[in-house]
Regions:
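Conserved alpha/beta-hydrolase
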Residues: 108-130
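An N-terminal hydrophobic leader/cap segment in hydrolases
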Residues: 6-69
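Acidic catalytic loop of the alpha/beta-hydrolase fold
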Residues: 253-258, 285-286
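Short beta-strand/loop motif that positions the catalytic acidic residue
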Residues: 242-244, 249-251, 255
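Hydrolase active-site cap/lid region
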Residues: 174-230
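Alpha/beta-hydrolase active-site loop
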Residues: 134-155
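Catalytic active-site module of serine/aspartate enzymes centered on a nucleophile-bearing elbow/loop
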Residues: 290-307
Length: 307
């Protein structure tokens, strides 16, 4: 009897650890947070005078609420910003526990000024989109494919760009390795991680001081048990090897969350399709607001070639 009690206690502790790891990595408790609630750090304070007015302008722009249903039955929401009928479309995908109005405060304006319509999506578990599990791009790539289908059904085969920041960048890079319609002409990836497993291990070890070899297997198993997905099912660094779509990859060299070398490893994996640029002094997801002129020039040159 005592042995059964001990075994039950061990099993309960193990399941608790799995669920703790799952909640830590894959759940978001504040999906409707204000865009102005971005982290207050020495890096963000430097760009605040540029970032806050850009967010405000984005929030004031007219839009249409849109939604689709994901392959696994979730309602996914977004905003559509119309410039002109028949114009190229840019689908914008924000980052992990991020806010699209922060991540695309600059890119939205670049697209608008270039005459592109914009479809700004809320990733699953974020904003008004349903879901309980963030999967670091593993299932989100299927969501982006669903948005592409929605856009083609609604707008026809207009030229299309995919644009992602942080986890959104990793997502669109994983999409790049899938079978895409011919009207997807280019992909912009801003500060992506090279693999879901690598960014989680980096955060656990470097940022949180946890024993990676002990905690990461629990997190991965928790994702499989409670989230029904496998962190190792795909990665940006592998997906780009299967891609034949032009890719623009931008990374700040002062990115302390997703280190710059991760961008370098992705670029090295597919040099024939990836154009890689570094923004000096830029923090994570702050490339545009750190150097708007250079960022605008890089994106404009790339999109003009693609479209």
């Amino acid at each position: 009897m005592l042995m059964l009690i001990l075994l039950a206690a061990v099993l309960a502790a193990f399941l608790y650890a799995l669920h703790f790891g799952y909640k830590l990595a894959f759940q978001y408790e504040d999906p409707l947070a204000s865009p102005y609630n971005y982290p207050d750090t020495d890096q963000t304070r430097k760009v605040k005078p540029v970032l806050d007015p850009a967010i405000a302008a984005f929030l004031e722009a007219p839009y249409e609420d849109v939604s689709i249903t994901s392959h696994d039955g979730l309602k996914l929401t977004g905003r559509y910003y119309h410039v002109s009928d028949g114009a190229p479309l840019e689908i914008q995908c924000h980052g992990y526990k991020g806010n699209p109005f922060v991540d695309f405060a600059g890119a939205w304006r670049i697209a608008k000024n270039a005459g592109r319509n914009v479809l700004l999506i809320n990733q699953r578990c974020h904003g008004g989109s349903e879901g309980h599990t963030i999967t670091f791009g593993i299932l989100e790539k299927q969501d982006v494919m669903a948005w592409i289908t929605y856009a083609n059904n609604r707008f026809g085969q207009v030229p299309m760009l995919l644009n992602g920041v942080s986890m959104g960048a990793a997502t669109v890079l994983m999409v790049s390795g899938m079978e895409l319609p011919d009207n997807v002409k280019g992909i912009i990836a801003d500060c992506p991680y090279d693999a879901p497993s690598n960014i989680i291990k980096k955060v656990l070890g470097q940022d949180m001081g946890m024993p990676v070899k002990l905690v990461y297997p629990l997190i991965r198993l928790g994702g499989m048990l409670y989230g029904k997905f496998n962190l190792n099912a795909d990665s940006p660094v592998e997906a780009v090897k299967r891609s034949n779509v032009p890719i623009l990859l931008i990374h700040g060299d002062d990115d302390r969350f997703v280190p710059h070398p991760m961008g370098c490893s992705i670029a090295a994996a597919a040099p024939e399709t990836i154009e890689f640029h570094t923004i000096a002094g830029a923090a994570h997801a702050m490339n545009y607001v750190t150097d708007p002129e250079s960022y605008r020039a890089i994106v404009t040159a790339f999109t003009e070639r693609c479209l």
